């Protein structure tokens, strides 16, 4: 049985923020959510989140998560924090202790650490740093770990040690039940250090087995916004590398932001400053221009999305053409070879095969058939101030420029709407619809003159 404890009670003073540090984001998701995702991948039987500063905000942020909240009302150190969880632990379980502000530790690293745990051993995640300043040092005797000494308590010889404690450890819950109540706060900080259980473990002949991450960034925590930005770039670089290995061309890998997951087919090209949110799937040979934002959308093979376009919860079939400056809002569904041009907005709109909405239009709550042409400035008037209604435009229809289609309304198959019309009644197949005031030309009219 595996239980995970996540320390998330700290105030994060150096973030200079009104919200708890663990709720600040990496790739659009709170640090704490990243740690919880790793917990889920490890198939933890129970996850305990220690909260303190901003406890209500953390509870609200994790409202959909199956976690046990344990509140640390006084901030008396990491050992004191874990002590609060002790009554909730199964004495037969293995316990993995993680930190809510260390978001990039890999699942494989944690699984390796957990494997170190037995009745006669515990696991400790360490790392060797060129600059260990600020970290607790790993003290070894004849190669075996015997203690962790915090920076402020270290002597000159111990300060030379470059192997440092990451804070992440795995241990039998029964051992924690023995060691935690025996912790002392007789140190420079006057706090109860979780790291003091290492010396207790050594004294009880419980071997301390160490593991190290493949990459140093896995154990980097966040204490300020500069470090937050550094981790963001590390994360985004990883995503960029994965996309390029998968066969995508990134015109500048340093200018990509993924805030969710992205799946790419072969020969995709992604230009600079694109943002991907939620779950995004790109087919083969998809080209995305600069400065696009794509959220929770599926893009079919051969589709081209030009610069400065925004897509949200939309589905595009193959060989569509979007933008520049197009906005597809949730519920937009495009069949193959459909085109949405510049300064066009769609919402809950089904656009048929080969249909075109090329310029300056709004298409909302609409179903458009195949081979339809929507002229510039066309508006589907879908909202009467209370209710939304649907516009239906059947196959082959032609909508002239600057037309307003007042829903609910249907334009028949192969019908034509004259430019500037306000359409309020249904039409049948092949109709010509003209709904505008008759033009008058007044001969000899003189412009007014200033008096």
From Swiss-Prot:
Mg(2+) binds at residues 101, 223. Gene3D superfamilies: Hexapeptide repeat proteins (2.160.10.10), Spore Coat Polysaccharide Biosynthesis Protein SpsA, Chain A (3.90.550.10). Residues 247-451 are annotated as: N-acetyltransferase. Pathway: Nucleotide-sugar biosynthesis; UDP-N-acetyl-alpha-D-glucosamine biosynthesis; N-acetyl-alpha-D-glucosamine 1-phosphate from alpha-D-glucosamine 6-phosphate (route II): step 2/2; Nucleotide-sugar biosynthesis; UDP-N-acetyl-alpha-D-glucosamine biosynthesis; UDP-N-acetyl-alpha-D-glucosamine from N-acetyl-alpha-D-glucosamine 1-phosphate: step 1/1; Bacterial outer membrane biogenesis; LPS lipid A biosynthesis. Acetyl-CoA binds at residues 376, 382-383, 401, 419, 436. Its cofactor is Mg(2+). UDP-N-acetyl-alpha-D-glucosamine binds at residues 7-10, 21, 72, 77-78, 99-101, 136, 150, 165, 223, 329, 347, 362, 373. The keyword Nucleotidyltransferase applies. Its EC number is 2.7.7.23, 2.3.1.157. Residues 1-225 are annotated as: Pyrophosphorylase. Residues 226-246 are annotated as: Linker. One of its GO terms (cellular component) is membrane. It holds the Pfam family Hexapep. It comes from the Bacteria. GO terms for biological process: cell morphogenesis; cell wall organization; lipid A biosynthetic process; peptidoglycan biosynthetic process; regulation of cell shape; UDP-N-acetylglucosamine biosynthetic process. One of its GO terms (molecular function) is magnesium ion binding. Binds 1 Mg(2+) ion per subunit. NCBIfam families: glmU. This is Bifunctional protein GlmU.
């Amino acid at each position: 049985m595996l239980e995970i404890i996540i320390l998330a009670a700290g105030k994060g003073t150096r973030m200079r923020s009104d919200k708890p540090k663990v709720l600040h984001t990496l790739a659009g998701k709170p640090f704490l959510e990243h740690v919880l995702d790793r917990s889920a991948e490890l198939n933890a039987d129970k996850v305990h989140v220690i909260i303190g500063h901003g406890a209500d905000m953390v509870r609200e942020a994790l409202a959909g998560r199956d976690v046990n909240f344990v509140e640390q009302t006084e901030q008396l150190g990491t050992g004191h924090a874990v002590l609060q969880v002790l009554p909730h632990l199964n004495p037969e379980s293995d316990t993995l202790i993680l930190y809510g502000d260390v978001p990039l530790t890999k699942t494989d690293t944690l699984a390796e650490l957990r494997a170190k745990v037995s009745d006669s051993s515990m696991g400790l995640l360490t790392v060797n740093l060129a600059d260990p300043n600020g970290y607790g040092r790993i003290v070894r005797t004849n190669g075996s770990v015997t203690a962790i000494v915090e920076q402020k308590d270290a002597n000159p010889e111990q300060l030379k040690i470059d192997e440092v404690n990451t804070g992440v450890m795995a241990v039998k819950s029964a051992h924690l039940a023995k060691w935690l109540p025996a912790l002392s706060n007789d140190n420079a900080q006057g706090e109860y250090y979780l790291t003091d259980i290492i010396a207790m473990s050594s004294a009880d002949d419980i071997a301390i087995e160490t593991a190290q991450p493949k990459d140093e960034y896995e154990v980097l925590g966040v204490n300020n916004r500069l470090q937050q930005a550094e981790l963001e770039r590390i994360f985004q670089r990883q995503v960029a590398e994965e996309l390029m290995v998968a066969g995508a061309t990134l015109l500048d890998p340093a200018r990509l932001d993924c805030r969710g997951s992205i799946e790419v087919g072969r020969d995709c090209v992604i230009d600079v400053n694109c943002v991907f949110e939620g779950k995004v799937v790109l087919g083969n040979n998809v080209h995305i221009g600069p400065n696009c934002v794509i959220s929770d959308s599926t893009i079919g093979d051969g589709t081209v999305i030009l610069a400065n376009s925004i897509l949200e919860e939309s589905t595009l079939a193959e060989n569509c053409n979007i933008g520049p400056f197009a906005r597809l809002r949730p519920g937009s569904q495009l069949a193959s070879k459909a085109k949405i041009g510049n300064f066009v907005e769609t919402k809950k709109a089904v656009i048929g095969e080969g249909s075109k909405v090329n310029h300056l239009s709004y298409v909302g709550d609409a179903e458009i058939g195949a081979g339809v042409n929507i002229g510039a400035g066309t508006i589907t008037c879908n909202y009467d101030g209370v209710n939304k209604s649907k516009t239906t435009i059947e196959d082959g229809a032609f909508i002239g420029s600057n037309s307003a289609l007042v829903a609910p309304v249907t334009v028949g198959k192969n019908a034509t709407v004259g430019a500037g019309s306000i359409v309020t009644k249904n039409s049948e197949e092949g109709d010509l619809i003209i709904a505008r005031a008759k033009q008058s030309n007044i001969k000899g009219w003189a412009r007014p003159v200033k008096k």
